[in-house]
Amino acid sequence: MEGSTGNQSVKEVAVVTGGNRGLGLEICRQLASNGVTVVLTARDEKRGAEAVSILGSLGLSNVHFHQLDVSDPTSAVRLADFIKEKFGKLDILVNNAAIAGTTNEIGNPEIFRQEVAGMDRMERVKRMREHMTEPYKQAEECLRTNYHGTKAVTKALLSLLQSSSHGRIVNISSRYGLLRFFSAEEFKQELNNIDNLSEQRLDDLSELFMKDFKDGQLERRGWPTEGGFSAYKVSKAFMNAYSRILAKEHPSLCINCVHPGFVQTDMSFQVGDLTVEEGARGAFMMAMAPKGGMTGGYLNCTEFAPFV
C-alpha cells in the first residue's frame, strides 16, 4: 500500500496527488529538494513506487508513496489515516490529479510531435482537438476526477491541514477553467459570486451539466463548447469556485489555484510550450508561500490573475 525512501524528521509534510509522472512528479521533486517531506500519491501502485525510486536516485530520501484513487472517497480516507498515523498533521496539499475527459486517436505520439513541430500554440492545440472525441463516459469521469475527486481528497485531509500552523492547499487548475469560456452570462455571474455560491449548488450544476451533455444541450444552455474540452473546462471552473468557497470558509488556511501553463506532459502529448520544471514553479511558489499570504486567488503560471 505504501512505501518510502526515508526519514520523518522534516518539519513540513506535503501530499501531491497524481505524483507519479509529469507535472506532479516535478512538483514532488521541487518540494522534496527544498526539505519538505512529500507523500507522493498515484492510483497505480507500481508506477507510484517507481516514481519514488526515481526521486530516491536523485538523492531525495524524504519521499513516501501511498496509493490514492481520487475518484474513490474511501481511498482518500485511507490516505488521511496514513498521514495521521505517520505524521500527525499535513502542511501542504497539492491537488494535481486530473484527466482530460477525451479519447484520442493520435496514434504514435512521436509522429504527431514531429507533425506539429514549428506550429504556434493555437495551431498545435487545434491539431490535438482534431484527433480527440468527448464521449459521455469520459466526460462523466472527468467531472468525477477533477471536481468531485478534488473535493473528496480535500475533505478527507482538511482536519490534518487545520492541525498545521500554516496549512496550504494548491489546486492545479487551467486557463480552460476561466469563466470566459462559458457563453451563458448567468453561469459566469453565478460562479463568480462566491458570497452567494454554495458547494451544494456546484454539485447541482455538475449534475445539470452531465444531463445537458447526455441530451445534447450544452451549446443551447451556454456551457463551454467552442474549441472542445467541454467537460475539462467545466470541471476546472467548478474546482476554482470550490477553492474560493473553501478559502472563504477556512480563513486560517491558504488556498489557491494555479494554472501551470501549456506544459510538456502526456496530457499535451509533450507538445506544450513549457518544461515540467517551468510549469511547476507556480505550484511550488504557492506551496511554499509564507503565512498570511494570498488565499482564494488564481495564478496564471506565476502571476496573479482574475478567475474570469
Regions from the PLM with identified roles:
Residues 99, 105-143, 162-248, 259, ...:
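Catalytic loop of short-chain dehydrogenase/reductase
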Residues 45-46, 67-81, 136, 147-150:
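The beta1-alpha1 cofactor-binding region of Rossmann-like NAD(H)/NADP(H)-dependent oxidoreductases
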Residues 63-65, 255, 296:
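Hydrophobic/aromatic anchor residues within beta-strands of the central parallel beta-sheet
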Residues 2-42:
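Canonical Rossmann dinucleotide-binding motif of NAD(H)/NADP(H)-dependent dehydrogenases/reductases
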Residues 48, 76-83, 268, 304:
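A conserved hydrophobic alpha-helix of the Rossmann-fold in NAD(P)-dependent oxidoreductases
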Residues 15, 39, 91-94, 170:
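N-terminal Rossmann-like NAD(P) cofactor-binding module of classical short-chain dehydrogenase/reductase
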Residues 152, 237, 257-265, 269-308:
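C-terminal helical subdomain
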Residues 94, 149, 153-157, 161, ...:
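Hydrophobic positions on the long internal alpha-helix
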